[in-house]
Amino acid sequence: MLIDFLLKCLPESGRNLDLSGRHAFYQDIEKYFVAFWCMFDNDEIVGTVAVKELDKKKCELKSLYLLENYHGKGLGQSLLRKAVVFGEESGYEKMYLDSLSTSKRALALYRKAGFVTTEQYNQNKFADIFMVLNLKQSL
């Protein structure tokens, strides 16, 4: 079900699902993420968001995806808030994310939530924007 969603959602944003390479972690989400949520409309996944632990004080926002038909309804904001609240309640001090400069809507959402641009913190060769949110101040 998740893989079907990703096969539909990723191409909407110009990405391709690579389960044997950069997206292999989707085959073992419980090992890779500390939290992973799916948003449903009836029995269909329409959005996802996840949190990955970087260390005891830092986590990373991952896999914030929403089918295009569901954009503009506040659902992306709800998914983001779910992850941020989880990060706060789990005791993380900072939440990082990486993205693409072409993902204008996503970047606007992140900035509205309080994320600011930071230095590159990982080796993701597919990302060109790196952001951080101070969770201690986001409450």
Task: Mark where each language-model region is.
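Active-site acidic-Proline motif in GNAT/NAT acetyltransferases
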Residues: 67-73, 101-102
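Residues forming the Rossmann-fold NAD(P)(H) cofactor-binding site
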Residues: 73, 77, 81
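C-terminal "cap" of GNAT-fold acetyltransferases
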Residues: 93-96, 100-113, 119-139
